Structures are given as C-alpha cells and as structure tokens.
C-alpha cells in the first residue's frame, strides 16, 4: 500500500518446525544487495516464533545479484528510497490500491466482507476508492460480480460501520498514511485536533516528542495526498471517539481544576 516492494526469496524447500518452507522474505532490496542474495547463495533460515521464516546467516553469497527495476503489478519504473525500492504509481498501481483499501477495512475492524478477494473484485470492476465503495448500492455490487445476498450484506456492513463507535486515532491510521500507524496516530491526535491536520506543518509535528524530521515530512505529504478522501469519509459522520488533547488532560488533572479563584482588594489599573 505504500509502494514499497518487498523481495521474497525462493529457496529449496526445507522443513522447519514441522512446516515445509520454500519462500523467505529478504525484507528490502537494500538487504538483497548488501548480503548478495541471489541464485546459488547458501543461507541459514529459521522460523521466528515458529511462524515467519527469516534469514539468520548468509553462508555463501551469490556470485550475481539481480534487482528488479519494474513494478510487477503495474509495470512502472521503480525508484530507490533509502534501502527500499518504491513504485511511484500510487494512484493507479492495482497492488497499492487493493492493499490500501484492504488496510482500511482491516484496521477499522468493524466491517465484514471486505477481504482481499472482495477488494480485488471491486477494483477490477472500477470501484477502486473508499469514496466509490461507500457510495455503492446493492446493484453496483451485483454488477461487480457479487451475488444478491452478498451484495445486500456488503451494503449493510458499510451502513453499520458508520454507527459503530471507533477511536479517531484508529480511523486516522486506517488510511495507510506512511509513517502513521496506530501508535503515532494517537500521539499526533493527543497534540493536534483532527480537523487541523489538513494544514499541519512539518515543524509542528517535529515539536511533538517521538517524531523525527524525515518521519514528519512523510506524514505531512501523506496527509496532503489523502486529505480529500479523509474529508469525504469524515462527511459520512462516522461515530468517532475523540482523543483527549494532552493540554486538556493536564488542565483537568491540575490541583486547582474546577476551583473558583476570587481576588479582593484594590487594583492599581482598571476595575475588577
């Protein structure tokens, strides 16, 4: 969904912790170059937590390393961003569109029926944005290849998602803005109100503890890119639970919070 291309290594199948493993993540393209991973390399692999296979050692590096230069989903030329290869075709790359939509529904957590297969079917039919999905009717879903019953359920789920209370930080993180996961979304909204995010600056975010310069720049760019969609979704009146600002929390917990203060005596200037 962010455009980052994650290389996956095809290895000779080996049994690890009772499972047959034939694919291992290389994490990012920079890792492939640095470790010289390629055909003929010999590596040591383990299942992290007995679930995810990962490389623990390169016993023998490859004599030749091949790095792809085009996105397998849309064919766009890939660009380097630090150690990552990025597909810059954010608005039209099918893989990015599908993963972005799936991320929203998965993060929201209160909308059933919008898994990867359903999202793929919708995108193929041209219903490829949150705006289009939430504006779709049962008939639109049927024209996209869903049956009458499933189409009705999809529409009901969308309606239900508007009425179920959801934390505003979770809602924000669901849009898949780079560098803005759930924890950072909560931290951001503890310092800046949601409706002020459209005009937030890099400097304002840097001033918040935990945000570095590059991260802040990415967040500002991501908010700008996604704001039209965020604004549309806010207009649907989702039932958002507002994050309390740290300043408000400080005032509420102040020793003199709720007390009335009265001054007596004369004032040298103006009246009481």
Regions found by a protein language model. Name each.
Residues 1-102, 269:
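N-terminal cationic and glycine-rich segments that engage phosphates or anionic surfaces
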Residues 3, 40, 115, 181, ...:
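A residue-level signal for conserved active-site and pocket-lining positions in enzyme catalytic cores
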Residues 28, 129, 194-196:
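Alpha-helix N-cap recognition
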Residues 31-32, 42, 108-109, 173-175, ...:
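Generic recognition of flexible, low-complexity loop/linker segments
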Residues 80-86, 91-179, 184-190:
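Extended interfacial segments that mediate partner engagement and assembly in macromolecular machines
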Residues 125, 144, 150-272:
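DNA strand-break repair and replication-stress modules
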